[in-house]
């Protein structure tokens, strides 16, 4: 399978339905704009779903797990074995995102792309194995061209499965010790930012640890200074799970499935996806502003205003999942409120 598919045309939201939904908002029993962004969200989902009465009930959450060679540089508070251990935890339902998915009635897909501490075959985990870890970005490219192709395809496969269920919203998450370092390095390359501006606490680093992380990122950027395109930067500085997110975002936009983007790492993947296929941007909604240092710069680059700011930095799609009740509320208000005519209330 080639990767030419990533440049395929994205779906286009329905402008007629959008106009009809906006007209309905103007007739609901409230002052115009009184429900603020909730009104905008309902109209946006109407256009995405081509339905004047949108709902957000069928949700697909995919968490991509993979290890990183750069973990050998001591950039995390946790040992690399944690990635594989968390895959087991996802499968058993004990992780934060597993709890949130149950509360939301969402489908949770866990994808093992390659971890050092391999848990083997698990009943609730899709095995899309590429390698035990991507390479150390301080020494060589994170992925070979074939590995990048396979990681992108693993993300697209999530969307192929989600489409068969009539999914109304896709949420992507990640797990991988060292992946905030890879995401920060990738973001620096895409945004021409200094490592000191993008390196954050990740799993809980102190000031000394963050400074070391920035030094590691500086080394990686020097090794890959000649990476000239977004795709090549992804291949050299990213990781399997970051590339899978990129593939999922592009495939979702092509399929007309809205995406709720999670935190720092997921937003770095979103920026790559938009660079590779600008039509993706119209299908992205951003769940929250992470506590991770570099997230604000990524959001600015995407001209994105997230729904929440709760000082989260867990990943796993957890922050995005927390925002889903807001989307449901927006649609419920849009669909359930009476118009002035229906209620017999005088309009302004």
From Swiss-Prot:
General function of this protein: Catalyzes the synthesis of alpha-ribazole-5'-phosphate from nicotinate mononucleotide (NAMN) and 5,6-dimethylbenzimidazole (DMB).
MF terms (GO), sorted A to Z: nicotinate-nucleotide-dimethylbenzimidazole phosphoribosyltransferase activity
Give the catalysed reaction(s), semicolon-separated.
Answer: 5,6-dimethylbenzimidazole + nicotinate beta-D-ribonucleotide = alpha-ribazole 5'-phosphate + nicotinate + H(+)
Report the record's Gene Ontology biological process terms: cobalamin biosynthetic process
* Gene symbol of the encoding locus: cobT
Alphabetized PANTHER family for the sequence? NICOTINATE-NUCLEOTIDE--DIMETHYLBENZIMIDAZOLE PHOSPHORIBOSYLTRANSFERASE
- Pfam families, per this entry? DBI_PRT
From what organism does this protein derive?
Xanthomonas campestris pv. campestris (strain B100)
Q: Using the UniProt record, name the top-level EC class of this enzyme in a single word.
A: transferase
Its annotated pathway reads: Nucleoside biosynthesis; alpha-ribazole biosynthesis; alpha-ribazole from 5,6-dimethylbenzimidazole: step 1/2
Instruction: Write the Enzyme Commission number(s) for this entry.
Output: 2.4.2.21
| Protein's name according to its UniProt entry | Nicotinate-nucleotide--dimethylbenzimidazole phosphoribosyltransferase
UniProt KW keywords? Cobalamin biosynthesis, Glycosyltransferase, Transferase
Q: Which family does it belong to?
A: Belongs to the CobT family.
Catalytic machinery residues: 316 (proton acceptor)
């Amino acid at each position: 399978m080639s990767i030419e598919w990533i440049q395929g045309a994205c779906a286009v939201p329905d402008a007629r339905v959008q106009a009809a939904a906006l007209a309905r908002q103007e007739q609901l029993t409230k002052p115009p704009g009184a429900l603020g962004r909730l009104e905008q969200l309902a109209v946006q989902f109407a256009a995405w779903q081509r339905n004047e009465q949108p709902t957000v009930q069928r949700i697909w959450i995919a968490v991509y797990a993979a290890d990183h060679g750069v973990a050998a540089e001591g950039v995390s508070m946790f040992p690399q074995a944690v990635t594989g251990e968390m895959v087991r935890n996802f499968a058993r339902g004990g992780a934060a995102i597993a709890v949130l998915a149950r509360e939301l009635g969402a489908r949770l897909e866990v994808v093992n792309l390659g971890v050092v501490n391999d848990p083997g075959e698990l009943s609730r985990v899709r095995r899309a194995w590429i390698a035990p870890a991507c390479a150390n970005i301080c020494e060589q490219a994170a992925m070979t061209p074939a590995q990048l192709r396979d990681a992108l395809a693993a993300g697209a496969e999530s969307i192929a499965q989600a489409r068969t269920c009539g999914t109304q919203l896709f949420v992507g998450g990640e797990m991988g010790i060292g992946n905030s370092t890879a995401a920060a390095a990738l973001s620096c390359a895409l945004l021409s930012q200094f490592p000191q501006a993008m390196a954050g606490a990740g799993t809980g680093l102190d000031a000394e640890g963050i400074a070391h992380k920035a030094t590691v990122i500086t080394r990686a950027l020097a090794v890959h200074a000649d990476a000239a395109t977004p795709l090549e930067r992804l291949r050299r500085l990213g990781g399997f799970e970051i590339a899978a997110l990129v593939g999922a975002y592009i495939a979702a936009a092509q399929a007309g499935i809205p995406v709720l983007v999670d935190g720092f790492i997921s937003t770095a993947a979103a920026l790559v996806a938009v660079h590779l296929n600008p039509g993706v941007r119209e299908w992205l909604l951003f769940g929250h502003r992470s506590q991770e240092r570099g997230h604000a710069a990524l959001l600015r680059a995407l001209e994105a205003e997230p729904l929440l700011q709760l000082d989260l930095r867990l990943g796993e799609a957890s922050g995005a999942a927390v925002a889903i009740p807001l989307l449901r509320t927006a649609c419920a208000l849009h669909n359930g409120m009476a118009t002035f005519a229906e209620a017999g209330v005088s309009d302004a």
